[in-house]
Amino acid sequence: MRCISILGSTGSIGRQTLDIVDNLNISVAALTAGTNVERMVQQCRKYRPALAVMATEEAAAQLQIEIGDIPTRINWGEEGLVEAATVAEADCVITAVVGMVGLKPTLAAIRAGKRIGLANKETLVCAGELVMAEAKHCGTEIIPVDSEHSAIYQCLMGNHSKEEIKRIILTCSGGPFYGMKKEQLQTVTKADALRHPNWKMGPKITIDCATLMNKGLEVIEAMRLYDLPLEQVDVVIHRQSIVHSMVEFTDGAVMAQMGSPDMRLPIQLAMTYPERKECPVDALDLLTCSSLTFAAPDMEAFPCLALARQCAKQGGTACPAMNGANEEAVALYLADKIGFYDIYDLVSKAVNAVPFIANPTLDEILEADKLAREAVRRVAKQ
C-alpha cells in the first residue's frame, strides 16, 4: 500500500490511524472531519493531503482561510466524503466516521475498488447485506478495524469454510458499569459512562459500550461480515480486554486472538494485510497479565444488548431503525437532555414506531433511519 484516505481523521480512530501512517511512512491522499477545524489544520499542514473535507460549509470555509497557503483542495458534506472515499491516489480507505454518514462513502469506495479498513460498524448494521453483496460483486476487500472483528478475521485467515465454524464468540469488557444492577444504573452520571476501563475511544462509542449497545451492533456486524445466523454469534464478558474474540470450530477447537488493548494493532493490520509490520504498541506480556476471566452478560441490567439481538433476528429495517434511534438517543444523552436508561426506552419505542420492511432497498433503509430519529426526538419531548 502506498497511499491512504482517512474518513474521520480528527476522531479517535482517525488520529490513531495517522500514528500508523507515521510508522509505515506512507502518504495521505485525503482527510475528512466533522467541525474540528483546528485539528484538521494541524493534520493538513503535517500530511499535505490532496483533499480535505469538513462536514459543514462553514467549517470548510474556515479551513480554507487557515490553510490557503498550501495546495490542499477543500470540499464539504456528503459530496466531499464520497470524493475522499474515491480519490484516485488512495489504495486504502479507512472509514472511521461515526454513524450512518459512513454508508454512502463506503459504497462509493467499494465501487472504486479501494481496500476498505472498516471502523464504521453502522454501515454493516444498517445495510450489511447490500454492502457485502456489492463488495463481492466488485471484488473489493473489506477488512474490519473493530478489535473484535479483526480478531475473528485473523482467526479465520486459514480460509476455513463456513461449515467448519460452530460459533463466533465476541468478547466484551462489560464497560464502566459491569456488575451493577438496574436500580444502581438509574443514578449513574455521564462522566461515569464516559470512563471506559480499557479503551480510549470517542464519546458516542464509549456510551454505546456503557449500555452494551456497542456489543449488540457488533453482533449484527459479525453476522454480516461472516454470513452467519444470530444463533452462531455469542457474547462473553472479558474484563481484561486481552482476548479480543474467539472462533469455536465444529471439532471443538477454539481459536482466539490476543493482544494489548490498543486500536493501532487492528488499524495497522487492515492497512498492511496480508503482511505484518512492526507496530508502535507495547507487546503483550503474558507473565504480567492478570488472570483471564469470562462471564455471561447481564441482559436484564443492560437491555440494549437484548434489543439488538432481537432486531438482528427480525432483520430488514429493524436494524437501521435501531441504529438511527440509538445515534439520536446517545446524542441527547451527551447533551444532558435524557438519562442513562432513557436511551434504551427511546430506542425500543422508536424501533416499534417504524414500519417494518423485510427486504428493504437502500432508500428504504435510509427512510427507516430517518423515521427512527424523528420518533426519538418526538418521544423525548413528551
Per-region residue spans from a language model:
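Catalytic, metal-anchored helix/loop core of enzyme active sites in primary metabolism
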Residues: M1-Q382
